């Protein structure tokens, strides 16, 4: 179990208890599906995946959550509403704290992972509520499984949440919304590195793994009318 990163709000007890049951189950299911579908695919890529999307709010400048909007809860509820607009009914949005949210996208088409983040960030960038509160939106996501050998211990689900956080914290944004995602790279088939080795390395230095093609890092570019 990984330690909580510095300056990150801990997961409330109710959310923690839910994730301790739900997320390991979904990870195991994603592992089994990947092993079955990749065995039928010429490039051993999974037909579906699990998307872990971490949404974080931060002040562009000044104080956290300035006064005019009547408190934190309205902004937090607004972010949850934005998430529900871009995910399906079968997906799960979770409020980790007022500043941080998690969305678990089940049985996701790997080609659709980028679109989900792009749509959400476009809506966040256009939000009058977030604009009035002077807040920036960051999204980091992990497309699971990351390896053709998906053997990551599912009880260590917090590590994957931490990895999504790490992706949300990449680079210094210039606008009101930014996002980065992590997914398996083209060299993964040849390497066959198991997730039990890959994911701890990714948490320390995803860029090094991306340079050798074991992983890919996607940067979300906002487009008009997305």
What are these regions (language model features)?
Residues 9-31, 35, 44-54, 58-84, ...:
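Conserved long alpha-helical elements within nucleotide-processing catalytic cores of c-di-GMP signaling
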């Amino acid at each position: 179990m990984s330690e909580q990163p510095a300056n990150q709000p801990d997961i409330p007890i109710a959310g923690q208890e839910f994730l301790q049951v739900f997320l390991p189950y979904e990870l195991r299911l994603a592992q089994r599906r990947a092993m079955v579908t990749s065995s039928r695919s010429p490039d051993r890529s999974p037909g579906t995946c699990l998307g872990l999307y971490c949404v974080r709010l931060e002040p562009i400048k000044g104080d956290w959550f300035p006064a005019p909007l009547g408190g934190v809860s309205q902004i937090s509820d607004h972010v949850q509403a934005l998430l529900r607009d871009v995910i399906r009914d079968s997906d799960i949005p979770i409020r980790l704290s007022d500043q941080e949210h998690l969305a678990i996208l089940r049985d996701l088409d790997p080609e659709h992972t980028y679109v989900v983040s792009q749509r959400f960030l476009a809506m966040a960038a256009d939000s009058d509520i977030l604009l009035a509160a002077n807040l920036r939106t960051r999204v980091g996501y992990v497309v699971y499984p990351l390896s053709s050998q998906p053997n990551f211990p599912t009880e260590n689900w917090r590590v994957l949440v931490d990895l999504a956080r790490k992706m949300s914290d990449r680079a210094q944004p210039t606008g009101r919304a930014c996002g980065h995602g992590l997914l398996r790279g083209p060299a993964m088939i040849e390497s066959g590195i198991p997730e039990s080795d890959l994911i701890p390395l990714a948490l320390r230095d995803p860029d090094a793994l991306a340079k050798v093609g074991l992983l890919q890092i996607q940067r979300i570019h906002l487009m008009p009318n997305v």
